[in-house]
Amino acid sequence: MVNDTRADYDHLMVESDEALCASVRAGNRLAEEVLAARYHRLVRSCARPYFLAGGDSEDLLQEGMFGLIKAMREYEPGHGASFYTFAETCIRRRLYSVLKAATSGKHAPLNHAVPLDPSFFDANLSFANADPEMLLIDREKAASLLENARKLLSEFEVKILGYYLEGLTCREIAETVGKSPKSVDNAVQRIRRKIARQLLSGDISNG
């Protein structure tokens, strides 16, 4: 039985996103697991700007995964957008929704996750409308905000931030830069503190 499950999983691993989504809609839990593993890094990448601004990593990842699961169950290939684009939209829209609720106190565990600078928060505004054409605009705005944040960091911290926002784990970053996971984690915490101070001062979006 275990071998059969392993064989089924291995078979699904080589399936396209579109085929896996069809299997998910048909009730295949293994297909859902495969897609969740395939896109977990995207979820981390979408959530991490908010984590750097003071949010709880586990809460944000959980909400992002809810957005990914919604994408799996609702994706329709005939509508033009790739699954990657649709999934990113759903993940960011979910994060935007819960963070917006947090500002009104409706989601207490995430209250501290809301970026303190309105323009940082609004960088994800159009995702609430699930318009894939707005993805590039939002990426450019977020990139501008993060570029200002990078001015606060050391050369090593800038390197770590780049990999971190790509969704790599601390262990993966450590292997890439030749440092210990502890060193990378310490750098991430320094980055969070520096960004939080600048968000509080209101300087981070002014360049």
Place the predicted regions along the sequence by residue.
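Short, leucine-enriched amphipathic alpha-helices that occur as contiguous helical runs
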Residues: 17, 40, 92, 142, ...
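Short, small-hydrophobic-rich alpha-helical interface motif
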Residues: 24, 39, 43, 60-71, ...
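Extreme N-terminal regulatory/targeting segments of RNA polymerase sigma factors
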Residues: 1-59, 151, 169, 199-207
